[in-house]
Amino acid sequence: MIDPSSSEEEGEDDAVPNVSSKGRLTNTTKGTSAVSIIGGSAGSVVGSNIPVSGSNTDLIGNQRQSNISSICNRNDVGNISVAALGSTSNKIEQICGNRADTGNLEVPSNGIPSGISQETLNQSVGSSRANSLPRPLSPSPSLTSEKHETAEPHGKHEREEEERKRRIQLYVFISRCISYPFNAKQPTDMTKRQTKISKQQLEIITQRFQAFLKGETQIMADEAFQNAVQSYHDVFLKSERVLKMVQSGASSQHDFREVFRNNIEKRVRSLPEIDGLSKETVLTSWMAKFDIILKGTGEEDSKRPSRMQQSLNSELILSKEQLYDMFQQILLVKKFEHQILFNALMLDSADEQAAAIRRELDGRMQRVGEMEKNRKLMPKFVLKEMESLYVEELKSSINLLMANLESLPVSKGNMDSKYGLQKLKRYNHSTPSFLKLILRSHGSLSKLEGDSEDGSTQLTKLDVVLTFQLEVIVMEVENGEKLQTDQAEASKPMWDTQGDFTTTHPLPVVKVKLYTENPGMLALEDKELGKVTLKPTPLSSKSPEWHRMIVPKNLPDQDIRIKIACRLDKPLNMKHCGYLYAIGKSVWKKWKRRYFVLVQVSQYTFAMCSYKEKKSEPSEMMQLDGYTVDYIEAASANLMFGIDLNGGRYFFNAVREGDSISFACDDENECSLWVMAMYRATGQSHKPTPPITQDKNSAMSKIQGDADKARKHGMEDFISTDPCTFDHATLFKTLQNLTLEYRLNDPYASLGWFSPGQVFVLDEYCARYGVRGCYRHLCYLSDLLDRAEKQHMIDPTLIHYSFAFCASHVHGNRPDGVGSITHEEKEKFSEIKERLRQLLEFQITNFRYCFPFGRPEGALKATLSLLERVLMKDIVTPVPPEEVRQMIKKSLETAALVNYTRLSNKAKIDEDLRGDVIVPAPKKLEDLIHLAELCVDLLQQNEEHYGEAFAWFSDLLVEHAEIFWSLFAVDMDRVLSEQAPDTWDSFPLFQILNDYLRTDDNLRNGRFHQHLRDTFAPLVVRYVDLMESSIAQSIHKGFEKERWESKGINAALNPAALNNAAQALNTAALNPSMILCGKKDQVNFYVPKLPKQSNSTAANDEMRNGCATSEDLFWKLDALQSFIRDLHWPDAEFRQHLEQRLKMMAVDMIEQCIQRTDSSFQSWLKKNIAFISTDYILPSEMCAMVNVILDAKNQSFKLTTIDGIDLYKFHAKIDDQIDKANVAMTQGLSGKLMSVLESTLSKLARYDEGSLIGSILSFTNVSSSGKDLGQGYVNFFRNNMDQVRGKIADDLWTLHFFEQWYSQQINMLCNWLSERVDHALHYAQVASISHIIKKIYSDFELQGVLEDKLNSKAYQAVAQRMATEEATCALTMPDACEDEPCDEIREGEEEDNGDESTSNIPRGLPKPKVAAAQAAAVTNVVAGRVGNLLGKGIGGLSSKLGSGSWF
C-alpha cells in the first residue's frame, strides 16, 4: 500500500535519536555516562599517554564555579577522604537548528511522490491539457542522457551477470535508504492482511470436513449442523472456482469462514424460535465448531520452517536488519555480499550516510542547473511552458529533501539556532577555479536566493560550545583495602562510587586529592595526604589506571598510588577531536600544535575549532562552508606557506577560493580519521585518497580494509558510483516489479498491497532519488495488470488508488504538487487505461469465476466503481450513466453465454444434443432436468453473492438472467420435442423451473416464464384429459366387477401405512410417470406398496373404508388435484380454469359412484325377501356400499371445494345427492332388520286370547315358557349390531342408525301391546317380550345410545305393561312362574358364559325367599288390577267376560 503519510520527515529511532513523532524539532544534549569499575591489583602502575596541553593551571584556580565533594573511606591506616574537583560552567550556550515559528515543522508534499491518500482522490480538478508534444525517452530528471546502451549479451551467462550487477547496484541504493531514512516511515495504519490458503492446505481442510462428516472426529453436532457442513463441503469446498481462487492467492481462512457464516445465518434465521435458546447462541456455537474443524489441531503451525515464520512477520513494523534481509531475498543478494557492502558503505555510520545524502543532493542540484541551461536534457512535455515548471519542481523537491535532512537532530541545542538551513546564505559554493573540474560544490536552499557574500551569517564562538559528561571513579589506594564510600557530603557533584560532572571544556583539568580525617572535635580542616591531576579527553583510556600522587614533603610516606577511572564522553555533535599542527592564512596563522574539535552545528553546518585547557569557547574557529579537504605532501605544505613546517609527519589541507589551511599529525591512522571526518563535513564529491608512499605496515583504518575487500569481490564500482548518473526511474521500475513478485508469493493474501516495510523503502527510494509519482504509479499499474491478466487476484481498490492518482496528474490536478506532465506519462496512461478497461470488462463478464462466492469481499463492487472511473474522459466530467450501463449490459450479456456454456458442458447436454453418439430421449430429459437444477443454483448464488454489488444495475442483472434462461430454452425445446407423445417425465422440469421463477419477483411472468407456460400448457391439458378419461373408464369397469369388499380403513388407522401412502402420493404428484402408463387413451395410476402389516393390524383387516373401485377413484381424484395444485401454475386465469375443471370432474365422478353404489344396494335389498328369520345378518357387501356413500361424503368436501370454500357450488349439489342416497340406504337397512321383529311378533300373536292355536299350544305345553323365541330375537339384533359396528367405518352414522333402529323396535312393540290392551297376554308372550325389552335396553346402551333416547315414553309404556302382565301371570299361573327365578339365574349364567342356547338346560326348584317376594309383588299388582276392573263399571266387566276367558 502506498501510505499517504510516508513523506513525513521522520527517521528510524536507532539511526537518528530524539526525533519527534510529529516532525517537531527538539534540542537534545547527548552525554550519558557509562562507567566500567575495575578493581586493579596493587602495585601495577599504568602511565597515561594523553598529550598534555600547555596549561597546567590548578582546577581550583579557575574563575568558573567548581564544586568539591568529599568522600569518606575507611581503611587500616585511618580515616582518609578523597576529593575530586570538577569544572562546570555557569552558562552553556546551546546551538539550535532552525525551528518554525509555531513549533511544528510542516513539510509540504510537493516533489515527494511517496504515495496517495483519500484527500488526493477528492482534490479539486484543474483544467485538462489538450495540447501534446512528442513522447520523451524518460521521465527521470537526470542530467546524463543515458543514451549509451550496452549491446545485449549473446550468452545466457553474460545476461545473468548483467542482471546480477544491476540487482547489486540497486541493492546499494536500497541499503542506503534503509540505513538512513529521512523522508518516509513505516505506516502503522495499513489493513492487516490474512494468511492465504495454499492448494495443499485446501486439500487438508477438505479432508478435515470429510472426516467430520464421516463421524471420525470428537465434535458433537446435531443434524442441522451436519446438513450445513455437508452443504458447505459439497457446494463450496469441492467447487472448481474455489480451487482457482486458492491458486490465485486470494483466499484466506477468513474468506472460508465468512462464506460458511453467511450460509448458516440464512439457515438459522429461517428456523422456528426455540424457548430458552436464542438464534445468536446457535450461530456462535456453530461457528465455534466450524473453527475447530477448519483449523484442526494446530500442529502444522509448530512445524513451520523458520524462513516461513520470518515471512509471516512481514506485516509488522520491521527492523533495519529485517528490511535488509527482505530486500536481499527480493534482489537475490547473497549474505556475504550484503556484509561486504554494509562495511564498505559504512551503513552503520550516520555521519557517513548523511554526508552521502548531502553529496547526492548537491549533485542533483548541479544537474538541474545544467538542465536549465541545456533544455535538450529535459524530457518532452505536453506543453512547452512546462519546461520551466519542471525545473522549479526539481529545485523545490531537492530543497524539500534538504529541509527533511536538516530537520533530523544532530545534538541538543542546534535546532533553534539562527544558523539553521533556511538562514544559511552560502554553504560550500566558493570553489577555487582550478578545482572546479575535480570537485563539485554542495548546493543549499539559499543558493537559489543569491550568492552574496555580504548576506552570509558567520558562526560565533558561542555557537560551537560543547557539553561533556565527565566521570571520575576512585578505585583503591595501594597497600590498603579497597575503598568504599559510606556517606556523601557535597551537593554537586554527588559522589557515590563515582563523581559525575557536566562541563563545557573540551580540555578539562580534574584534580583528585586525598585527605585524612582529623579526629579532633574543634578541628577545622582535614590533613591532605596527596593529590593527582588528570587531563582527560574523549579519546583517553576509559579503563582504571594507577596514578602516583603528589605528596607533601612533610609526610613520611612519599609513595602513594591511587587507581582512578576517568571518562570524558563524546557529544553527538562533536565529530572528531585531537591534537594537530595547523597553519592558515586567515586563522591559525602560526604553525603550532593545538587541540582541535570538529563540531556539527546542524546537518549542513560544520566548524573546525581549536581549544585551550579549561576554556569552553574556542580560541579560534573556521566554518567549513565551501572547503575541500585532501591529503598533501609535506613539501607541498612548505611550498604553499613558504616556510619550513616542523612537527607532524602526515599532512592534509582544507582549501577554498581565497583561503587554505594545512594540518599535520604524527599518526597515520589519526590523519585518515581527520580527513574522513572533514570529507563528510564539507560535502565534496571528490573522495580523498591516501598517498601511496605511506608505510604499508602502518595500521590502516577499517575503512580502507573494507574498501580493499569490496575491490577484491568486484564491488568497488557499485560503491563508488555516483547515484546522480543513474536513471532511477528505470531502476525503480525493476525494484517495484521484483518487490511485487515477492509480495504475491509470500504467505499473505495481499491482493497486490505492499507490506509496511516495502511501502517504507519504496517511498524513501522515490523521495531520495527523485522518481516521479505518476511514473511510479504507472509502473505499478502496469505490474498489477500483468499479474491480473495472469489470473492473480488484485484488489480493484488498489488499482483505483493508483489510477486515480495518474488520472489526476495527467489532467493537471497536481495530486503530489507536480504540475509538469511528460509526453511519455500521457501516452503510458492512455495505454494503461485501455488495458484496464479490457481487464475490467473481462472480470465483469466472468464475475462468477473472477470473484467466486463474492470473495474477496467487496471486490466486485469496487470493480464496478473502478469501471466508472476508467470510463471518465477527464477528472472533472462524470461519465454518462448510460455509457456505464451499456458497458455493463454488454458484459453481462456475454456473461450469460459464458455461464450457460460452462454449465451445459458440466451437465453434458451439448454431448447429448450435438454429439456423435445417439443418446436416448429419456437420458436427454434426465440431463436437462439436472441442468435446470444447476441453472437454478447458479442464479440463486448470483443473487446471494453478487446482488448487492449490482444493486445499482439490478435491471441489468435481471436481463442477464433472462438471456441465460433464453439459452436454456433453446436446449429445453429441442429435448422436449424429441420426447415420445403422452409421456409425462417432463413435469418435474416444469416444477423445478416454475418453483424458482414464481418466487423471484424480477423473473416472475418474465419472458422465459411466459415461454415455460406456453410450452407446458398443452401438456397439462392433455394430461388432464387423459386422466379424466381414465377415471371414467375405471368407474365403469370397476363397478361392473366390484365384489364390494371393504378397502382402506386399515390404511387410514395405521400410522405407518398412512405415512407411506402420503409419500406415495407426493411421489406420484411430483413424477406423473410413476402413476401413468404410456397408453394413449388410458391412464393407470401407480398404487403405492403398503408396508408389511403386523399381526394386530392384520386382525383388524375387515375394518375398511369403502370398496376397491371407490378407493381407487377418490385416490386418483385427490392425486390429480394435488399434482395440478403443486404445479403452482403462474397464469391465474388458466389456474382457475384447471381448478374449476378438476372440481367439476370430481363432482361428476362422485355422482356416478353414488349412482352405481345405490343401484347395487337396492338389488341387494331385494335378495332373501321370501324368508326372513332371526338367523339373518346384514351382508358385508351392503355395509361396504354404505361405507362408499359415507366416504364419498367425506371426500367430496375436499375434492369439490377450494380451500374449504364452495366457490363453484359443486359441493352443495353433490352433498345433496349423497344425503339422499344415505337416507335411502339407512331406511333400507332398518326396514330389513325390522322385518325380523315383525316376524317374531307375528309368531307371538298365535297366543292371543281366543286363538285356537294358542289354546292348543297351551294345553299341550309345547311352547314351554316362550323365552326361546325372545332369546332368538335378542341373538339376532346382537349379531347385526356387531356386524354394523364392525363393517361400517363411520361411528356417527352407526350411532345414528342404532338410535333409529332402537326407536323403531320400541315403537313396534308398543303398538303391538297397544292392540292387546284389553286382553291379558299369554305367559309365553309375556316371557318373550319381557326378555326382549330388557336385553334391547341394555345392549343398545352399550352401543352408545343415550339415556334420553333409550328411556322414551314408548319404552316406559312397554315396560309398565310388561310389569303388569308379569304380575298377573304370577297370580294366575304360579306353576309356570315358579321357573322364573331359575330362568333369571340361568340367564345370568348365560350372560357370564356367553352361551346363547338355553333349550337343553334342566329346570331347577324355586327358592323359598324368592317365591315369597314374588308372591307379594304379584298380590299388589293383582289388587291394583281388580280395582281397575271394578272402576270400569259393569259394562267393562261384561265386555271382559263376554269377549272370552283367560282359561
Swiss-Prot record:
Gene Ontology BP terms: dense core granule exocytosis; exocytosis; neurotransmitter secretion; positive regulation of calcium ion-dependent exocytosis; protein transport; synaptic transmission, glutamatergic; synaptic vesicle exocytosis; vesicle-mediated transport
Gene null: resulting phenotype: Flies display locomotory deficits and complete embryonic lethality. The mutant NMJ reveals a 50% loss in evoked glutamatergic transmission, and an accumulation of synaptic vesicles at active zones. They also display a 3-fold accumulation of DCVs in synaptic terminals.
Region (Disordered): 1-35, 101-163, 1386-1406
PH domain sequence ranges: 573-683
Highest taxon of source: Eukaryota
Signal peptide: none
Organs and tissues of expression: Restricted to the nervous system at all stages of development and highly localized at synapses (at protein level).
MHD1 domain location: 970-1157
Primary localisation category: membrane
Acidic residues bias: start-end ranges: 1-15, 1386-1395
Composition bias type Low complexity, residue spans: 127-144
Keywords (A to Z) from UniProt: Calcium, Cytoplasmic vesicle, Exocytosis, Lipid-binding, Membrane, Metal-binding, Protein transport, Synapse, Transport
UniProt-annotated location(s): Cytoplasmic vesicle membrane; Synapse
Entry's free-text remark on domains: The PH domain is essential for regulated exocytosis and binds phospholipids.
Function per UniProt: Calcium-binding protein involved in exocytosis of vesicles filled with neurotransmitters and neuropeptides. May specifically mediate the Ca(2+)-dependent exocytosis of large dense-core vesicles (DCVs) and other dense-core vesicles. However, it probably also participates in small clear synaptic vesicles (SVs) exocytosis and it is unclear whether its function is related to Ca(2+) triggering.
Name the UniProt record assigns to this protein: Calcium-dependent secretion activator
